[in-house]
Structure formats: C-alpha cells, structure tokens
Amino acid sequence: MRSRENFLLNDLRGLEQLRRELVCEKARRSIAEFCLFTDDRYQMNWHHRLLCEYLDAFTRKEIRRLMVFMPPRHGKSELVSRKLPAYIFGRNPDANIIATSYSADLAQRMNRDVQRIMDGRLYLELFPDTRLYGKSIG
C-alpha cells in the first residue's frame, strides 16, 4: 500500500510540475498572463485584457506604432511603463527601450519598479537568463 501511495504522490508532483510549466509558458507568450503570474495582486479587467492584446501585437511587431488613450487611473502606466518593459526584456534581453515622462522623478520611479519586477523570484522563474547588471535597488 505504501508504494502505491508514493506512486500517486509522485504522479501528483509530476502533474503539478507540468501545470506550472504550462502556466510559465503562457506567461512568456502573453503580457496579460505575465502580469497575473508575476503579481498575484494584479486585478485584470476587460479593458486591461484589451490593451494587453494590443501590447502583445506590438511586441510581436504586428503593430509598429501604438498610442494608448485611457482615462487617468485605468492602468496605463502599470501596463505600459512598468510591466511591458520587464516583459520585453525577458523575451529579448538586448531590446532597447526608451522611457519618457513629464517628470524625471516619475520616470526614475517607473524604472525602479521595472527593476523590482525583474529582480523578483517569479520573473527569474520565467526568464532565468535575463538579469540586470549594475546597481541594485532597495
């Protein structure tokens, strides 16, 4: 009986590992899934999913230019200025991204947020070969 229980436990562990690998693969292919994987507090709404579809098309170079118009406090900065750069660097560590803002302070804060995402355990699980070099953040 003991060997059957061990067999079932190993089977369950294997299934859980397979499930985790599938979740990770989805997060590598979709900015929406990336957001949900790396931030368990992120609340995805329909307008976030729609924006993510456009951002995915942008990262696949199906869209060359993308302008985002949404009311304040609807998640533009979180998706476009924080999550998207981290996602792009994970998929292409040699990418060049220029982040601009109306204030240097805001741009620096968003840059630190991107660094925090990229230094996170879950990010490194998705993109183990993507690392930041240089000054660490607190």
Show the residue positions of the predicted features:
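Contiguous, well-ordered alpha-helical segments that form the cores/surfaces of helical PPI scaffolds
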Residues: 52-56, 78-90
